[in-house]
């Protein structure tokens, strides 16, 4: 997948300046950076839900899970099946994300973590050329996060999609990402193999970020 160069300006201030790159299939790209660094703006533009300063053309089908996804006032099972796919797919995803016992519960009565699991299952019902997940496990507990990460890995490998994962969790990036992009003040400061960016970054700003938000040594 080819991402062209693009930028985004708000009230005369450039919030994002992306140089463009190519993304490899069957790879997970962790998008890292502090709050306000441009991560979500990048994700929204690639997903096509936010316009850049100039038109951006990205080929292929794209699935997008925003930070605050919409849940229909229907049952968990009905929400998941709205994406299409088979009942068998829905059963498998509900079981993997511990939603089977909640299948008849209305979505507007779910907790934050339950909703996060449901909307992830709904997205993964379909096959896309690229999937963009913006903080998909932020509301989940450790057990649910582990199940979600396992599904994300499985989906990426089985479909061969490009998966873009916006995350504040360095631990999550270390567990499942193949590649990492580090944004700072709207600029892509560093990009490369996750192992390199997360443990042996070239830029001082990346090192400082890793030291502040988490230990850079392997455990």
Residue ranges and their predicted role:
Residues 198-219:
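C-terminal boundary and immediately downstream tail of ABC-type ATPase nucleotide-binding domains
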Residues 106-110, 114:
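Conserved ABC ATPase signature
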Residues 69-84:
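Conserved catalytic motifs of ABC-family nucleotide-binding domains
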Residues 167-168:
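H-loop/switch region of ABC-family ATPase nucleotide-binding domains
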Residues 131-134:
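Catalytic Walker B motif of ABC-type/P-loop ATPase nucleotide-binding domains
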Residues 32-34:
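The feature captures the beta-strand-to-loop junction immediately N-terminal to the Walker
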Residues 88-102:
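Conserved ABC ATPase "signature" region
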């Amino acid at each position: 997948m080819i991402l062209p160069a693009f930028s985004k300006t708000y009230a005369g201030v450039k919030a994002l300046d992306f140089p463009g790159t190519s993304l490899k299939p069957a790879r997970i790209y962790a998008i890292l950076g502090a709050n306000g660094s441009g991560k979500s703006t990048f994700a929204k533009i690639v997903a096509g839900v936010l316009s850049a300063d100039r038109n951006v053309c990205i080929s292929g089908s794209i699935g997008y899970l925003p930070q605050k996804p919409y849940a229909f006032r229907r049952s968990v099972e009905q929400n998941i099946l709205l994406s299409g796919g088979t009942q068998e797919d829905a059963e498998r995803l509900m079981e993997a994300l511990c939603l089977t016992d909640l299948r008849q519960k209305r979505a507007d009565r779910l907790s934050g973590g339950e909703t996060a699991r449901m909307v992830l299952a709904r997205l993964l019902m379909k096959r896309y050329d690229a999937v963009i997940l913006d903080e998909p496990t932020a509301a989940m507990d450790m057990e649910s996060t582990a199940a979600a990460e396992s599904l994300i890995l499985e989906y990426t490998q089985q479909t061969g999609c490009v998966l873009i994962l916006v995350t504040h969790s360095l631990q999550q990036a270390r567990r499942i990402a193949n590649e990492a992009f580090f944004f700072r003040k709207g600029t892509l400061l560093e990009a490369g193999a996750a192992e390199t960016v997360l443990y042996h970054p070239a830029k001082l700003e990346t090192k400082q970020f890793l030291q502040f938000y988490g230990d850079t040594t392997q455990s």
